[in-house]
Amino acid sequence: MKIPQRYLQNRTSNIMQEYATINKSILDKLNPSNLYRFFCLSLYRNDYYKVRWRIKDLARHTGESKDALKNFNKDMEAVLVRKRYSEPINHPVYKFTMRSLYCIPPIEQPNFITISHLFMKVNLSVKVKGYYIKLLLIADNNKIILSSKKLADKLGMGKKNIESYNLDLYNAGLLRFLSNGFELTPKDLLLSNDIAKQRKEWNPTNSKNVVKLVFKSK
């Protein structure tokens, strides 16, 4: 049986939210590139913080090749749960393929930040964007009073990379240097945590979440 393409397309998450939240606890669990990829993934969560995406969907939104994401699912095991499910496909031999359902972790009050979807439009590399998210996670009042060496030690990164990324952020208008560190200038990219909504929990006793079955006696 041929399955309508419209039905197959609806099996992926294609509605982008206005923002994504990032818990401070994941700071040391993901490298900069994966942290930005996690942000992009989170933007397409539903009310239950679930995302149905293929690797090629993620690659399309981050502007990367699929090869660059070959270890993505394994790396994400440090911060989220990935469930596998079968999906029907139009294929002469195989009736279905396996897809991923990503379960985004709930908000950890009060230790999180809220980032606007507009961050995706910033013209910087995936690594630099992920590095900026790390800076937002550790900043105090948007300020980081650390030398490049101390910051590199804190984030587990190379000092030269830190200095290079800082220059990219400065040129993009997202950072300004101070005499003893620097200040982040995210403007409308960093939102108030007050707007963030916690994920909904699946409640099988809620009639809206249950498919009602009626059995008729013969």
State what each model feature region is.
Residues M1-K218:
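Electropositive, intrinsically flexible nucleic-acid-contacting patches
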